[in-house]
Amino acid sequence: MKIHKVLGLMSGTSLDGLDLAYCHIWKKLDRWKFEIKETRAISYDIDMRARLKNSIDLPADELLIFHNTYGSWLGKQAREFIEEKELDVDIISSHGHTTHHQPQQGLTFQIGSGQQLANVSRHKTVCDFRSNDVALGGEGAPLVPIGDLLFFGEYDFCLNLGGIANVSYEYEGKRIAYDIGLANMILNHITQKIGLSYDENGKLARKGSINNDLLEGLNRLEYYKLPFPKSTGYEWFIEKVVPIIDATVDTTENLLHTSVHHICEQVALQIKTKSIKDQSTLFVTGGGALNQFMMELLQSKLAPTVSLVIPSKKLIEYKEALIFALMGILRMEQEINVLKTVTGASKDSSSGVVYLPS
């Protein structure tokens, strides 16, 4: 039995930082298994967070320079982690950081040069997992459902609450997935105005009350009316959501409380309309799963027919890095790692670009 030893790297839309997960992944009786052996979360400093946040507005030459700079930074973090923990690594599998995602224009771009990452880390690197799917007419997102299918297929629904909320589930023998809408991105935007990176356990949100005008404004967002397949990201958030939040005069607690209600309403609407069983399970990961107030509110909106399953903190925090590690293995094995039923592409694909260190 071959054990793949992979370092998965993930930087999400919430701009919290870089997640590193060193994983052993193997196949037993046609089922993929995993063990997360070592992890590290590197918080972005103020400068890096600002550069990533503003990268969407950079001129082309400056964006490409930052693409290389960030790739070198990723390589440095990976190499230091590998050396400090004395890890035996076959490949590094990196998502990069999405700066532009306009699949309707045939465009998706994740900064973090794979060649720079490979050179600095001194390890074979797989990255750029989205562009092939977009070239095949797909949304290039979400990508995590391949891991939901292969690792967590026993659950009826898999919900990830990162910067964006996305869900995947099995329907008529096919994996279906899409971005539901807002999650931590809106909450972090609100807390950063008072100098906090996030609302720990939803403590501030719990103290607030609903601002009905804000709730109605968020629920009216056109994205929620779009048909599947669909995906969204930071550009949509900046263009459509930030103006609504910034124009609302209210306390931080009320803004957070209302936003959490909005997130839970939209998630519950999607899950309840898709559930066909008397009792369904919803497997929840991503930073939102650590928000106790959000989890209590979501469970109340889904009861009694849907039960939340919340795994270990390690899996909550590193699931995406784990799944990108899996995607890198599948790419190296030339197996399917992006599903057309999820993205709307013309066919399934084995996506990702392989870089060798020089």
Model feature map: region roles:
Residues 2-9, 103-108, 115, 119, ...:
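Phosphate-binding/catalytic loop of phosphoryl-transfer enzymes
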Residues 6-24, 289:
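N-terminal beta1-alpha1 ligand-phosphate binding loop
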Residues 17-36, 41-42, 173-264, 334, ...:
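Conserved ATP-utilizing enzyme core subdomain
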Residues 59-114:
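Short beta-strand-loop/turn "lid" adjacent to the catalytic site in phosphate-handling enzymes
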Residues 73-81, 252-278, 331:
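Phosphate/ATP-binding catalytic cores across multiple sugar-kinase/actin-like superfamilies
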Residues 99, 279-298:
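Glycine-rich phosphate-binding loops at beta-strand->alpha-helix junctions
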Residues 158-165, 336-358:
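Extended, charge-rich low-complexity interaction segments
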Residues 299-323:
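Conserved phosphate-binding/catalytic loops in two-lobed NTP-binding clefts
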